[in-house]
Amino acid sequence: MSFIPHDLGRQGEHTAVTFLIEKGYRILQRNYRHRRNEIDIIALDRRTLCFIEVKTRSSASKGHPLEAVTPEKQKEIIRAATAYLSAYPSPEPDCRFDVIAIIAHDFTNGRIREFKLEHITNAFMT
């Protein structure tokens, strides 16, 4: 069965959310959009507000998922985070930008069955 990249990305985000919850994060929002910018996951890690980008690939043959978080993509995430924070009750919390990279070794029937997940905290700065 062939896969649709959008389905792989959606399953990657679901896998990331499950991972974060197991690590004790509280998920506040998924797929937050501000204009053309999006943040995949917004979560609390204790008292730190985390803006998390998830990149999923079916293999590393087309490059590691982290390579897709380019400086331009980082700027887009920062713009969306700034918009999110403008509506946040003050005082603003400590914030950080994380990236979760997933390589799905087995993606069948629309589900990721085997994968390698890498969570990079403080992956980039403003």
Curated annotation (Swiss-Prot):
<comment type="similarity">
    <text>Belongs to the UPF0102 family.</text>
</comment>
<dbReference type="InterPro" id="IPR011335">
    <property type="entry name" value="Restrct_endonuc-II-like"/>
</dbReference>
<dbReference type="Pfam" id="PF02021">
    <property type="entry name" value="UPF0102"/>
</dbReference>
<dbReference type="InterPro" id="IPR011856">
    <property type="entry name" value="tRNA_endonuc-like_dom_sf"/>
</dbReference>
<protein>
    <recommendedName>
        <fullName>UPF0102 protein Cphamn1_0017</fullName>
    </recommendedName>
</protein>
<dbReference type="InterPro" id="IPR003509">
    <property type="entry name" value="UPF0102_YraN-like"/>
</dbReference>
<dbReference type="GO" id="GO:0003676">
    <property type="term" value="F:nucleic acid binding"/>
</dbReference>
